[in-house]
Amino acid sequence: MSSIIDIFAREILDSRGNPTVEVEVELDSGAVGRAAVPSGASTGAFEAVELRDGDKSRYLGKGVLKAVQNVNDIIAPELIGMEAQDQVAIDKAMIELDGTPNKSKLGANAILGVSLAVAKAAAEECGLPLYQYIGGVNAKTLPVPMMNILNGGKHADNNVDIQEFMIMPVGAPNFREALRMCSEVYHNLKNVLHSKGLSTTVGDEGGFAPNLTSNEEAIQVILEAIEKAGYVPGEDIVLALDPASTELYKEDGKYHFEGEGIVRTPEEMVDFWEQLVNKYPIVSIEDGLAEEDWNGWKLLTERLGKKIQLVGDDLFVTNTQRLSKGISMGVANSILIKLNQIGTLTETLDAIEMAKRAGYTAVVSHRSGETEDSTIADLVVGVNAGQIKTGAPARTDRVVKYNQLLRIEEALGSTAQYLGKNAFYNIKK
């Protein structure tokens, strides 16, 4: 066992050029852990609070010097001397120190940076890779990538309403081949778009961001790219969508697809998703309805919950209270896991545990504003989640996670598992 002797935070930049928090934790053994905190664009109203300075003369108000100061002046003195391996006690101490339900006093970005850096330092102290420190001897499942290759909504400056169009290589024998398949489709998609005279600039998460005639056209160009890469849609590679519907939901209680000029009621949204699922090989829809449209979610789950994966992101915000409500209402069948939505490693693990016990899947995810930190790669293997969302095979802030997963698969050798279609263990195949 080794105790914490130093905690230090600094302001660094994320992949969008905005400031974020990085924390280093040192133990008396000399072990050091470093973690950087991500930041979202389409954030749920119920997420833990990311503390920003608000000083318009610095970084347009997005500085994080307050959060950095909170780590250095408030959190560090409280935690120095604590055992690094006592993650639960450390996270609990920070939650109590903050004293608010949404971490708005110290900032979830301050607290999470410390929480993850402590775990990394403790893993180094134990001589274990982070995934094994988190998950123990049974951490062996490599995730199916849910790879975002075409961007719209808040992740791109185009007329496509649906935020993410993703591919999932369920027919791959292992993670390495899964990544290759996705990369090949990505490059073929670039050629398909180019041949149609469409833009191949990329969005925040590395996916292409062309202007298209409809959201459905996005699906069609991806299917064309899958076939051109030599794969069979629906067998080798399936599709997943993240419409980020909270962003489409307006005060009139309807969903506004401004790119297409269409307005839909919650019932019409459910009909729309059902039509797409019946027409295309879509196996997962994330945030198909808005974060507070519980009745719409209930209807969506009744109609499609046995057939496809329905992921709650803004709906659940990695929060056990929100998830518990969803489970009791029979809403959705999967939770998206974003570390910075809740703000500590312990609470993140609690949400994953609750989801699994209820028969919900868990999909570990990046944010649109990322860094070179690859913690989520270790987390997804550590908890055997089986699915990861971490963007396109482009932009180093995305690729760093995939490369870490390649290293983990290599280290696990013959014990590594890749679930493919079995990652969706709670729906009928």
Curated annotation (Swiss-Prot):
Cofactor(s) essential for the protein: Mg(2+)
Any one Gene Ontology molecular-function term assigned to this protein's record: magnesium ion binding
Record PROSITE patterns: ENOLASE (PS00164)
Keywords carried by this UniProt record: Cytoplasm, Glycolysis, Lyase, Magnesium, Metal-binding, Secreted
This protein's pathway: Carbohydrate degradation; glycolysis; pyruvate from D-glyceraldehyde 3-phosphate: step 4/5
The record's free-text note on cofactor binding: Binds a second Mg(2+) ion via substrate during catalysis.
Main location group: cytoplasm
EC number(s) given by UniProt: 4.2.1.11
Binding of (2R)-2-phosphoglycerate, residues: Q163, K338, R367, S368, K389
GO cellular component annotations of the record: cell surface; extracellular region; phosphopyruvate hydratase complex
Family in the record: Belongs to the enolase family.
Protein name: Enolase
Species the sequence originates in: Thermoanaerobacter pseudethanolicus (strain ATCC 33223 / 39E)
Taxonomy of the source species: Bacteria, Bacillati, Bacillota, Clostridia, Thermoanaerobacterales
